[in-house]
Structures are given as structure tokens and as C-alpha cells.
Amino acid sequence: PFASLVDPDYAEFQTPGNMPKRIKEYCKKTGQKVPETKGEVVRCIAESLAFKYRQTVEGMEDVTGNKYNVVNIGGGIKDKMICQFTANATKRVVSTGPVEATSIGNVIVQAMAMGAIKDINEGRKVVRNSFDIKTYEPQDSEKWDAAYEKWKEIIKNA
């Protein structure tokens, strides 16, 4: 865990191309262990994305003054590792909604417009009662906190 970490927003990752090669080059450039196997590259990506999500949630909290206790994930919910890593990194419960959350949201808005659903709260209740909602609890917070500090240093110096 945490052997290789990247900044998902790094400029070299923004255009199509050989991403594993670019990740390896980034890790070499930043003095980290270079991931060699597909599994090491995938873990690097998953952990790094989870830290980026934490940075984003904390930034939203700073801007709004609100504290968010739950992270809701729509797309990407099929990747259980990303969901668990996000819970671990953010130190928040991750709640996953339906796979087709965008389409379902559209249906809810249309039902509201037609008067079949009173308001957004009722729409949320309909979704909760109609689809499996899985939650992921944070684990190993101290390890993830230490690795988050390491990640922030890596991306600052990249």
C-alpha cells in the first residue's frame, strides 16, 4: 500500500496515451517506487484518486463552511476497491447509489414536473426504496492519514 502515488490532475495525464508508462515516469521523477505490475499500477491509481477525492471534499468544506459526513458515489460504484479506498481516504462513509444514477435522477425530475412526486426529498426516498444502496465504512484511518500527508508532499513537489 501507498508505494507509488500520483496527482490525477498532473498535466501529462490529461491527454490520451500510454497511461501506465506516464505513471511510471511520474513515479520515477518524484523518487518513488516505480510500479511494475498491472496490479501495482491499478493500486497507485486507486489510492491516488481516493486522496484527490479527500482533497476535493476538504476544499468544498473550506469554501462552504459545511461538514460533509457522507460521500455519495453514482458512477464508479461497481469498483468496490475505489469505494472502500474513498471511504478510507476521506474518513467518511461512502454511500453508493444506483449504477444509472443520472438516468434515474432524470426520471425523478420528470415525475416531480408531472406532480407524481412532491419534491426532491420524496424523490430521494423513492430511489432509496427502489435500489440497493451500499455503504462503505472508513478503515485504517491512521495509515490513510499518514499516506495522505505523503501524497500531498509528492504532488506539491512534482
What is the predicted function of each stretch?
Residues 1-70, 78-102, 108-158:
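Active-site core segments that coordinate phosphate-bearing ligands/cofactors
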